[in-house]
Regions:
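PEST-like low-complexity, intrinsically disordered acidic/proline/serine-rich tracts
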Residues: 17-236
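Bacterial N-terminal signal peptides that target proteins for export
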Residues: 1-7
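Hydrophobic h-region of N-terminal signal peptides that target proteins for export
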Residues: 8-17
Length: 236
């Protein structure tokens, strides 16, 4: 009897100490009413970047009003961080182990790795890339992720300009069985007057299987005005 009780208590202790489980396939969603996250903070860029940012924002809005898509990246280029975190309706799969949390975006089959329990590398030791270098640790039920080393050509959140000094901090938490929140803070001492903070909300897709997404550049092209067009049957 006492032996059984000891086993039960030991098992309970292990379970209590286990890291929160973020695994699953998560679809971008919205939360309204009670429990909804705070709205995004305004984007305030430094004067040297304001004209470029405002001009690009205007072109995107004008194209959208015409029902068109203004190209902000190459057709087959990945979105990279932080845009890959929420691309239209495309879901994201989270795989988790004690050593690494892996995020797989269905759009462009993007893969991002978060190395757990590691110290962040010096920026000079990181080869700039689409996803940068991410390290994570647990703060209670929240995964705190630190990311640097994203190259300047990568599309930014809401197309904000960024330098190689951009620093992204995330606080990822499973709010309920079927909801995941990711609070994102973007800092850049070169391009931003103040940090940009926003929260992404995801819903669990219980019976979904990720679909292969390969960009072969056969259906679309970018015209001379930077608008994404569909190729006609006779075009190559």
């Amino acid at each position: 009897m006492w032996k059984l009780a000891s086993i039960v208590l030991a098992t309970a202790a292990v379970c209590a100490a286990a890291d929160p489980d973020l695994t699953g396939i998560w679809s971008p969603s919205r939360a309204t009413g009670p429990g909804a996250p705070a709205p995004p903070t305004p984007i305030v860029v430094k004067p040297a970047y304001k004209a470029t940012f405002d001009g690009l924002t205007a072109k995107i809005r004008e194209a959208s009003a015409r029902g068109e898509q203004y190209a902000t990246k190459g057709l087959c280029s990945p979105y990279g961080m932080p845009t890959m975190l929420q691309v239209a309706v495309y879901p994201m799969e989270v795989l988790q182990s004690p050593q690494q949390v892996t995020l797989i975006g269905e759009a462009f089959s993007e893969v991002r790795r978060i190395y757990m329990g590691k110290k962040q590398l010096p920026l000079d030791d990181i080869a700039p890339g689409y996803y940068g270098h991410s390290v994570g640790l647990w703060d209670g039920d929240t995964l705190v992720v630190d990311t640097i080393g994203i190259k300047e050509s990568v599309q930014g959140y809401s197309n904000l300009p960024h330098s190689d000094q951009m620093h992204i901090t995330e606080r990822i938490r499973r709010v309920s069985a079927d909801r995941l929140d990711d609070q994102v803070t973007i800092e850049d001492p070169v391009t931003l007057e103040k940090p940009v903070v926003y929260t992404l909300v995801y819903r669990l897709l219980k019976d979904y299987q990720m679909v292969e997404f390969v960009c072969d550049n056969n259906r679309e092209y970018i015209d001379e005005n930077n608008i994404v067009r569909m190729k006609m049957g006779s075009q190559k």
